């Protein structure tokens, strides 16, 4: 085995261990934020939506800057610093008794994510030149298992004190920072040492990539509801916060049994864009009836459909984003690819929280879910138009040649 192949093989296992620590640290805390502050402390859902949206927007919206800096200085210092900032954000969240302090904790958490997320994604692109889609599927399976373990641990700790929940998340991110500081080599992310401004400019001039990323905002408006409206809905229907962990258990079971087989089968028979659109359509249609159900079994059935759509769409979305990235500025591209999540996540959290409160006060609980479903359908149509334009341009070039 060549030294390059050996480094990539070891890097794969490093990425899997690192990813598990990050997922555990995140899911111990964030699925319970809406339960803690809306259900236990009686805050309006929009207040918590602002906090979650702020974290999402800062982490993903500023990702291009984190990625561009990592292109210039390397992955290691950015990852270690970002994880320590995330730990500080969780520690602050544990003592939040006013909205501004919750918002500040999410600000710190988001800034940490801005620093560590793009270089981690770029390392996957760098180390997995072949079978990248399958590795993204493995990471998603790991995400699902880690989400359940984290949510179970967080739910158990919440019975005693929310500060224990946040302290556990903070400790896990400190451990992750130490793991990276100790074992992560000083790898460069890009094929050349790209100046910060040049990397950002290269992305902004790539109109096809920019349009694709911004269109995905609609996809993310639906996807982020697993952190806000779906846990609140499960809690309302079940009458107990402990039921939320079963929502993540469903995701884990589906991911561990279906994600990798579906990814392997579909990559042989369908284009990436078709897989993304099919998954998005299933997610959109499963959202629409959520506000009309009154039983936990019906709700979990719709959540199953939503997760199946995500299982189909997410590996294709991640692989498509990576395949469109320029190797000369990987960090910048992977950072900018998070902008759709920043915009869609922020609107999804704040708008979703506002619509949830509005629907509740107007006795129209189906309102936010129908709106999200319609947004998903429009995003599906927009992506279909983009992909058809790309195929038409390719056929024109082939004909001219």
From Swiss-Prot:
Membrane-crossing residue ranges in chain numbering: 13-33, 99-116, 138-158, 164-184, 213-233, 243-263, 276-296, 299-319, 339-359, 367-387
Alphabetical list of CDD domains matching this protein: MFS_MdtH_MDR_like
Entries under InterPro entries matching the protein: MFS (IPR011701), MFS_dom (IPR020846), MFS_trans_sf (IPR036259), MFS_Transporters (IPR050171), Multidrug-R_MdtH (IPR022855)
UniProt-listed Pfam families: MFS_1
Main location: membrane
Entry's Gene Ontology cellular component terms: plasma membrane
Membrane topology annotation: Multi-pass membrane protein
Cytoplasmic side stretches: 1-12, 117-137, 185-212, 264-275, 320-338, 388-401
Location(s), subcellular: Cell inner membrane
A molecular-function term among this protein's GO annotations: transmembrane transporter activity
HAMAP family: MFS_MdtH
Classification via NCBIfam families: PRK11646.1
Protein name (record): Multidrug resistance protein MdtH
